[in-house]
Amino acid sequence: MVKHLDHESVLNILPDRDVNANKGDFGRILLLCGSRGFTGAAALAAMGALRTGAGLVYLGVPESIYAIEAIKLDEPVVFPLADEGGMLSDRSIGDIKGRLSTMDAVLVGPGIGRSPGTRAVVTAVLESYQGPVVLDADGINVLSGHRDVLRGRKYPTILTPHDKEFRRIGGDLSVDRIQAAESFAREMGVVLLLKGHETIITNGQQTYVNGTGNPGMAVGGCGDVLSGMIVSLLGQGIEPLEAAAAAAWLHGKAGDVCAQELGQYGMLPTDMLRALPRLLK
């Protein structure tokens, strides 16, 4: 059964906020993002998480870009990890594992690049972390030819590929897109958010089709914001399918607000970040 979301249904998905709550009640989120030359991806993902209500955002980045991210960002807790060639190294895995048990959700992928080290990091998180994981961008790409690590995972996993990334991990788009997404999600035991015009979000049993968004969002960094939003909602206790669907709707609607106010040619992901609070009021 295919469902569509609207603003009211999305707001109903979001948890109520207790007057006595503290920052720890709204999710401790770990992001493993960025590499040399792709510092913006990490920053945008972190701010996407914060703008969607995460209480605490921890951002682990390669040591070589740590100073850049620390200057860029005020609210997230940024920390350096061992790197090789400007990308996360397998030597960072011990440090990462030491942090996982205190986290409510983890995002891996925006801007991390493709290397043996980043593949080792993605695999280690999937195998070690007993909680929900979001994989985006190169967090997906490094699993090309190694996707069995997804099938055996006992905890929620959300993948957010565009068409090319979907094909790299074995997705078959020769058939109907909804059918292809549902089949992949069932086979791999994941929630799949297949980006595109009318983004599809499915766990293989229940499916949402998102109607918000516009061509002005076809710009680098837009997907990084979305992945940060998804992991934020996961960390706040929302079920994986609903977290992905709500984030997709809000992300697209923020893009629509920016297109109306600024035009599709000049709007940026940072403009979408500024639009999000109005949609969550």
Tell where the protein language model's regions lie, with residue ranges.
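Small-residue (G/A/S/T)-rich helix-start motifs and N-terminal tracts that mark the onset
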Residues: 1-132, 141-158, 163-281
